């Protein structure tokens, strides 16, 4: 379940179980090790709520979250920040969902950064970059390439 940061606890409670993955959206800030948690409908319109990645992870765990959805990454535009998030997720055994601007050109590096950090579960969100603009369908060859890249990274 994709959730803004402030919606994680409500989603987990309404689900009534722990099996479903519930992510919490945090955003880059321009400073490695710091993330913006003010991603809800009201908080996103207020002064930014910026905390350490470790604090964000602890809060998400408190609320029953399974993972950080790190968005918008812009591919590798915030590479150093993404590395810090991946390292924190690994240290605190928390899953990571890199999101935003992921395509066939940067997928391997994005996945490898999280693997090298030791993240236990990585759920990359790959959106429009593998969708045919004319038909609106997912390009099967792109999916095959992504699977091959994933296998090459994880062995």
Regions found by a protein language model. Name each.
Residues 14-30, 80-98, 146-154:
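Alpha-helix-loop-beta-strand connector modules within alpha/beta enzyme cores
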Residues 61-123:
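Conserved binding-pocket/active-site segment within a compact domain
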């Amino acid at each position: 379940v994709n959730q803004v940061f402030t919606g994680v606890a409500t989603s987990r409670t309404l689900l009534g179980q722990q099996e479903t993955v519930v992510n919490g959206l945090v955003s880059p800030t321009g400073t490695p090790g710091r993330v913006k948690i003010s991603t809800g409908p009201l908080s996103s319109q207020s002064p930014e709520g910026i905390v350490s990645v470790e604090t964000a992870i602890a809060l998400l765990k408190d609320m029953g979250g399974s993972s950080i959805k790190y968005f918008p990454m812009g591919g590798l535009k915030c590479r150093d920040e993404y590395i810090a998030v991946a390292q924190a997720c690994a240290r605190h055994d928390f899953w990571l969902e890199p999101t935003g601007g992921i395509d066939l050109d940067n997928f391997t590096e994005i996945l490898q950064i999280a693997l090298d950090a030791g993240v236990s579960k990585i759920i990359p969100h790959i959106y429009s970059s593998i969708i045919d603009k004319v038909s609106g369908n997912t390009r099967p060859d792109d999916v095959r390439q992504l699977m091959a890249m994933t296998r090459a990274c994880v062995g």
